[in-house]
Amino acid sequence: MSNELDGSNKNKEVERVLLNVIDTLQDSQKGFATIGEHLTEDKLRRFFLAESLKRANFRAELENELHRAGMADVSETGTVSGALHRAWGELKSKLGGDDHTLLETAEQGEDEAKKAYKDALEHDLPLPLRQLLTEQQSHVLASHDFVKANRDALVTK
């Protein structure tokens, strides 16, 4: 990929797009871990902790692409809205948030992840990067649907 990105103004755009997705993945990784620790159903706990690891892997893949292209050093902070979202989820769990409430919070976070990937894929990106983002997006969409379905299932119990 580095040959496709060397020395153009397009580099800055690609870098900005990737950093936005990476920040969102950082938020997702932390959010899944935090919420996963507070869920009561074992199936959901396992899913959330595995999903946290998956988001860390996605982030590492994108960071590697940036490093290979000689671009940015990536922060470990995530976004401000992600930090607020995690804090809200933590507060809900401490105040007696049940699994349904925690899954609602997780779904909101997944909506942000879906948006980050959609926005990224609207840009002119090198084909290998577009393919990587498309594969990751597919997983994020499936994860969102899983979280939503489990949230909805808890309403009917």
Where on the chain are the PLM-derived regions?
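Charge-rich, acidic-biased intrinsically disordered regions
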Residues: 2, 8, 43-46, 53, ...
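Long, non-catalytic architectural segments outside compact domain cores
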Residues: 2-10, 14, 20, 27, ...
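Alpha-helical bundle segments that constitute or directly flank the non-heme di-iron/ferroxidase center
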Residues: 6-40, 99-124
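Alpha-helical scaffold segments that form or flank carboxylate-/histidine-based iron centers
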Residues: 13-21, 42-60, 99-103, 128-142
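Amphipathic alpha-helices that form helix-helix packing interfaces
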Residues: 21, 28, 35, 58, ...
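Conserved alpha-helical segments that form or flank metal/cofactor-binding pockets of metalloenzymes
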Residues: 44-80, 147-150
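Carboxylate-rich helix-loop segments that flank metal/cofactor sites and access channels
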Residues: 61-101, 105-114
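Preference for long, well-ordered alpha-helical segments
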Residues: 106-157
